[in-house]
Amino acid sequence: MRHWRRVFAHVAMISARDLLRTPMTTISMATVFVVFLAIQLLLQWSVESQGGDVDLLGADLGIVFMAGCCAVALVGTSVPLVAMRERGTLRAFATVPMPRSAFLLGMLPVRVAIVLLEMAVVLVVAGARGHLDGAPLARFAATATIGAAMLFAVALLVASRGRSAEATQQSMAMVSILVVFASGGLVPDEIVPGWAVAAMRALPTTWFAEAAAADLAGDPAFAPVPVLWAGMALVAVAASATAVRRFDWDSRGRARRPNEREKTHA
């Protein structure tokens, strides 16, 4: 366990340092959140300036937060890991005893910090609009924790065998956009066919957005929030376990560790 903690701390430090050295990476991860929030603020201002009383911002804050988490996790986590494999960095790591779980989790602390910053912004906006009291705040904290854990687990699973950073970035950016539109808030259910609504509600990202909207704006979710939590938790556990088991250090195939070579020659 002591070795596991040392590896985790070392990887976390390296990951944080790399992000500090490449501020454009951090900016790109935050851009999606900032853009979606700015759009919602502009729409709300437009409604209120015309005398309307529709709370578009409160209804879509959950989607804004989920979109920000998708950018940090699906793009900002999976792409750097695949790039490390593509450059051969992971192959070098494979020559020393390093638990996969410690390495993968060590990539997350600095990215979790970005998610927490986005969460703080969402809470400030929601509080300013009078949406928060004790119970919703605690529920949103639970939703954010479980939902972010799910997205990070999926990101690690995607990165576990990815070979091309460019292809991963393009695919994950497209997935992030699609799941935001499939979450239901940006496209009303009334204009979507019933089968499409059912398909969108089957997506774990929709569970995240629905639970967050219920916490932040009191919007009724299509299922009880604890049920949505349970579904997201199951996805997180399954994806993280599979990511650790399938993680490949080498772009040309799984690199053997020194002790594995010794067993082969014995």
Language model regions located:
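Hydrophobic alpha-helical transmembrane segments of membrane proteins
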Residues: 50-83, 142-156, 160, 243
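Junction motif at the cytosolic side of a transmembrane helix
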Residues: 128, 216-219, 227-266
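Transmembrane helix segments
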Residues: 38-47, 162-202, 206
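Hydrophobic alpha-helical transmembrane segments of multi-pass membrane transport proteins
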Residues: 38, 57-129
